[in-house]
């Protein structure tokens, strides 16, 4: 809040005194102009702020002004610009876990990777995936995560699980060392098959590692409800694993207009107009 004092002046009729001149303000009259100047009477006409009034008898008038709300958003914007540019949203880890008597299963998404281009844009360099972590039981409601085995599902493998019916099954084979000198020394096979009683599916991960002489099978049943949660989560996260959310968020009307003007008869444009 800032205070103005209005006092008579022999030459101009009134003088305006600003007690706090450092802030930009506008006048906000609590009463109308007619109420303020109605008691004033004189034969001499003076002009003040575009308003016509007659010279008044000697008296002091007090006017109160407040700062415009327009300046508050500007101050907030300046404060935001002063924040460190390196500051970003902290990374969040999420997952869905299933605990059974002989094993536990944790499902976690992994984000895709992007590489920068010379134009300043980014291109998808690696699709995201879903990490399955199997841990054998070490006791009642206890699991040995130091012996966990992992299996990464690609987007295509996720699609296979999503499309499974109540009596359908699928199988995936992974060799982490494929293309290397020790190819074939580690073998991972994940089987997803329906339970005999039709109550859900079981996930069976078989790991053979000749490098450390390991041969292990981890089996965990998944109920219909738990499987439905997995399918729902897979459907939701699929566009993010493909990186499509970044492209959709970057769509701008001016980009489409500029592209059409640069190549008005492109193949995509002709196909869309059919």
UniProtKB/Swiss-Prot annotation:
Q: What is its main location?
A: nucleus
Database matches in InterPro entries: ssDNA-bd_transcriptional_reg, Whirly
Q: Which GO terms describe its cellular component?
A: chloroplast; nucleus
Q: Does the keyword Plastid belong to this entry?
A: yes
Q: Which cysteines are joined by disulfide bonds?
A: none
Q: Which GO terms describe its molecular function?
A: DNA-binding transcription factor activity; sequence-specific DNA binding; single-stranded DNA binding
**Intracellular or extracellular location(s):** Nucleus; Plastid, Chloroplast
Its transmembrane ranges are: none
Is DNA-binding included in the keywords of this UniProt record? Answer: yes
GO biological process entries? defense response to fungus; positive regulation of DNA-templated transcription
Give the Pfam families listed for this entry.
Whirly (PF08536)
User: Self-association or partners: how does it assemble?
Assistant: Homotetramer.
Q: Which PANTHER family match?
A: SINGLE-STRANDED DNA-BINDING PROTEIN WHY1, CHLOROPLASTIC, SINGLE-STRANDED DNA-BINDING PROTEIN WHY2, MITOCHONDRIAL
Q: Which family does it belong to?
A: Belongs to the Whirly family.
Q: What is this protein called?
A: Single-stranded DNA-binding protein WHY1, chloroplastic
Which species expresses this protein natively? Answer: Solanum tuberosum (Potato)
Name of the gene this protein is made from? WHY1
